[in-house]
Amino acid sequence: GRDDSTVTIEVVRQLLRDHDDLIGLYNIGAGNRGVIEALEESQRKDDIAVVVHELTRHARRALVSGTFDAVINQNYKIEVDYAIQALKAYVDSDVTALPPPVQLDIYMRDNLP
């Protein structure tokens, strides 16, 4: 969906039309609002396991309502900090500096913060 909800909704609508046996959906990008809208209008949200990225207010509501089953969340502030550290190390020619891996959190309806 090119990280655009207006594109994502059309892609998911088509996917749902073409695959009546679909049991799972994974959205790696943005555009989760399009996924939500397409699933809710299709009346199939309870039949399809849905995993997306980034715990936004829309994703939170979709988890609570049961439209989404899991959200993989990364702390974007830490990601930006690590990216800046990596760029500084590159500019300083410090080939030994490696930022640590970014922690992932997986949220479901029962463990929302």
What does each model-found stretch correspond to?
Residues 1-57:
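Hydrophobic alpha-helical
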Residues 34-38, 62, 82, 86:
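Alpha-helical scaffold segments in soluble metabolic enzymes
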Residues 53-57, 74-79:
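Short, acidic/turn-prone active-site loops that include or flank metal/cofactor-
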Residues 78-113:
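Hinge/cleft segment of the Venus flytrap/periplasmic-binding protein
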